[in-house]
Amino acid sequence: MEVVSELVQFMQPNQRLDLKAVALTHVLGLTGSAEGKAAILALDDMLMAIFGLTFDDNHTVAKDAVLSLINLTADEECATKVFHLAKRIQPPFAIVEVAATQISDEQSPLADPWSMVLSNLTRVESLVHEILDILERGEQTLPRLAKAFAQLDYNKKKARLHYLAPIFCNLTQVARGRELCCHARYQLLEKLLPFASYEENVVRRGGTIGILKNVCFDAVYHGVILGEDDNILVAILQPLCGPEEFSDEENDMLPIELQYLPESKTRETDPDLRKMLLECLLQLCSTRRSREILRAKGVYEILREYHKWEARVGLDRDCLLACENVVDILIKKEEEIGLDNYKNVEVPAEQAEKFVQEDVEYVKSLLD
């Protein structure tokens, strides 16, 4: 602790550059261990010094300061401490505002590391409401962040801003975040949808799919998802589609974007993301109206071919089970189901455990 506290004097804005750089390099190394993070977070002066150096005129010093914040916010407990310490110190450090400003600044060379800091902070669900309060104070903050995400060449310093996807995903953990994402005022969801199939980066793609999952798990938005515009449903289905040919009759059922896909069409390579997409579809199967729309849009036909591929190529048991769960519902007639809303059904705990075990044994038999 004493060694750490001695570094603070060398991390002041008016200190010699070489001393700042060496001291900060040492601090950055300390943030790589739990003990080092604990020592730093126990000293308000040290955290204040790190905050201050994020604005340093020297790019390397400023970058190392932000990288230190990334490490300090890497787990939920430490992220919560950093967030509250930033408010408590004098003068307070507006960490969310600074991050949002840097990310939306086209000329910021530190937009990427700042996006990782904000991603870490928004991952803590207990902080999300307060972070949303801050982001909404500026009328243009959320629209600018959405623009920065949607426009791949937005940052002129070659920052890729992929971590905006998990930021938006984290914000949709809560109902208010989902409302903002789906609100016509911001058109956030519309801007994010194309990146559910973005092959170049799994962080951007995974964050976008996470947003879709969070929205699908909220029945309030099922009407929006399955409205006249097929964009959201297409974003969910496209990564599950392959190059298989359908009959003309089956093709006519599919959304136009999913008809006659080329032979080069590939499926999502990450099994965790495939499972999330299938979980989206399962949530959409909750009501009779939604099930009827999914059947009419050819979702069963798409999953029929997907299931063959997963059993032969993908070979992921969780994905096979997730697919089976959706197919089992869509293949039935509504008269057989006899329910308007599956979510109104209460399943006893012992029966639920039995279903889980049966599912495990069934999927195992498919892959053995």
From Swiss-Prot:
Family in the record: Belongs to the HGH1 family.
**Which Pfam family would be a valid example here?**
DUF383
**Can you say what this protein is called?**
Protein HGH1 homolog
Q: Which domain of life is it from?
A: Eukaryota
